[in-house]
């Protein structure tokens, strides 16, 4: 059986094509037929769900007691400021958590460059807009930044009745990977024309490079599968394995399968959101603009998506898929 493994092709080259500072294409070829989708789907899921990173988990803004407090002299609502801070990309070189402060005298724009950092803290997107001061007054805030992995809603970290007034907790998306897609193209080796070429398109927030992200995901996959290499016994016999689809089956499920409250489900359907894939592409800001959909319904939606390893604000390529059919787009 071990000798038979030598008959399988191994990739001969890995090419990295930078598309921008934080985006690159990683090309792997040649692969046996079907291996492109098998490896591509596994790497994509790991890149989106299992990459360690940092996120703002708690914010204190001078003069703000809760997220619905209107800040005099500030153009943005508190909710908008918190959503802006969610996009902050920070690299912690030594510590697992840190509290940073930001202070700016108005009028003017407050950006990530105004955040006071320590020697072991790096802001990767200093141009990030945080707030706009419209009067001659200061803007003061403190940010707690922590290491983590995946997506962690506030409800999974602490009970609502234990929070201190003025401490604004944020749902944390720790992954430094913003977007991942893959395509499988045809490859040829000598007379064989039925081979695969895997093309990964990876975009990060700058905390890690696309190359580093792919290396980490591949190492994680290797470590998780290594236990099977030492299994005793023969290989199971059975039919041919089904090729994994490029699109996560969960995304193809109707909204009703999420078992949301009737109010939340009806609000989503009124906005032509009929499938999970439709929902995850919407942002918190967009959903909060939905008539009759409040913060409570939004939290319910985020918690439910988190249970399936999903979150709002995801970018899906080639959505909707052709297999969804025309009937899906008019479902209600």
Swiss-Prot record:
Catalytic activity: RNA(n) + a ribonucleoside 5'-triphosphate = RNA(n+1) + diphosphate
GO biological-process terms attached to the record: DNA-templated transcription
Principal EC category: transferase
Residue pairs linked by disulfide bridges in the UniProt entry: none
Gene Ontology molecular function, alphabetical: DNA binding; DNA-directed RNA polymerase activity; protein dimerization activity
Chain segments carrying region Alpha N-terminal domain (alpha-NTD): 1-232
Region (Alpha C-terminal domain (alpha-CTD)) location: 247-332
Entry keyword Cell cycle: no
Signal peptide: none
EC number annotated for this UniProt entry: 2.7.7.6
Domain notes for this protein: The N-terminal domain is essential for RNAP assembly and basal transcription, whereas the C-terminal domain is involved in interaction with transcriptional regulators and with upstream promoter elements.
Family per record: Belongs to the RNA polymerase alpha chain family.
Subunit structure: Homodimer. The RNAP catalytic core consists of 2 alpha, 1 beta, 1 beta' and 1 omega subunit. When a sigma factor is associated with the core the holoenzyme is formed, which can initiate transcription.
Protein task: DNA-dependent RNA polymerase catalyzes the transcription of DNA into RNA using the four ribonucleoside triphosphates as substrates.
Name recorded for this polypeptide: DNA-directed RNA polymerase subunit alpha
Protein species of origin: Halorhodospira halophila (strain DSM 244 / SL1)
